[in-house]
Amino acid sequence: MKISILQPKAFKEKGRRDNQEDFLWPSPEQVTVANRVFILCDGMGGHDNGEVASCTAATALGTYRTAHPAPDGVLTKPMFEAALAVAYDALDKIDTGASKKPGTTLACIVVHRGGVLAAHIGDSRIYQIRKGEGVVFQTKDHSLVNDLLDSGEIKPEEAKNHPKGNVITKCLFVTDDKDRYMTPTITLIRDIKPHDVFMLCTDGVYGMVDNDDLA
């Protein structure tokens, strides 16, 4: 499968936060049609800890994945997981010994000969949007609200403004214990048509729009 990319677009805004904890790889100034790896991380941990965690994880993952292309052009889950291990190693190196460990969400797509590999952890999302059809693929948040939805404890209309809406159940975080690594959900997308758009965004974006607005 040959996939051509139009000029990617990227932007970030601090919004109401004191710090900009979102990190894009490549940066908005560096992204080109030659890129095949796109990463969004939303850090957490207070002060500048979240900012450092998101930058560290995204840079390590993106740099490794770009430097180690799949031999036959088709990326597999184990190949992506190898890059993820590099990101965890990089996070471990920023450990300051503080009791509160910084962490980050992850939304990543890798365009390859077999389609698009989509990986996410936490509540940063990946959307695949198709002209005339709207959203045809959307990642499922690793969050308390989604767990409550799945168990039937709350209804969909209660989810958007739920008081625990910012509680996530998985993230990449600083740890030297490999048994505690949290792994992302990885989806291999092969149903791709001309002019499909892949969008990576944080909760600060999708919290303000509905899927119909993305069509």
Language-model-detected regions and their locations in the chain:
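PP2C/PPM-type serine/threonine phosphatase catalytic domain
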Residues: M1-A215
